[in-house]
Amino acid sequence: MMLYLVQHAESKRKDEDSARPLSKKGWEDIRKVAKYAEKHLHIQVSQIYHSGKLRAQQTAQVLANHLHPARGVIVAEGLDPLANPKMWKNRLTETAEDIMIMIVGHLPHLSQLAGELLTGQANRELAAFTNGCIVCLEKGERERWKIRWMITPELVPNCDATALRLGAPIEDAQKILEEAAAIAEQRIKDTI
């Protein structure tokens, strides 16, 4: 089973709009990630689940427009920011092995769900979620989960994220990290 955990894209602050729709940057970031996921990562999903919050719904819809989930997009319970991750852990345990699911949600829930699946401990932060990122988990032998790869909006225009997949040559991963560090350093210089 493949599970794609997506933190909703950047949203407006509550004082700007109480519904907290995606910000202009949020729309740009998630479109970029979705397009990249379709064209370069070749993600295929059976269904996309999202919380009932507008920012998660908008993020899920952009992803669906690019990934074309066979069973569509559905709002689901238990995906709010403070939801108990064990509900989804149990649900995923009962899901068929050959299915590919995407969950669009919020922190701290997504981080806790990843910790629960990977270690059995919700308080273990194992992936550095950011707005608009996708973390791919795979359930393998003996029901054990592992992180396959992760992509953030900041990495998309600057590197080939497929090199971050497990088993990629270490030189490729090193090159990507060096490029990302150089870009981050330049951004810091630009703000000074």
Predicted regions and their residues:
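Residue-level signal for well-ordered alpha-helical positions
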Residues: 62, 116-117, 140
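Short, hydrophobic/π-rich interface segment
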Residues: 104-112
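Domain-level recognition of soluble alpha/beta enzyme cores
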Residues: 121-148, 152-156
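Active-site-proximal alpha-helix that buttresses catalytic centers in soluble enzyme cores
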Residues: 2-86, 90, 110, 122, ...
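C-terminal/domain-terminus segments
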Residues: 156-166
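Short, flexible helix/strand-to-coil boundary loops that buttress conserved ligand/catalytic motifs
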Residues: 114-117, 151
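Generic beta-sheet signal
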Residues: 3, 97-105
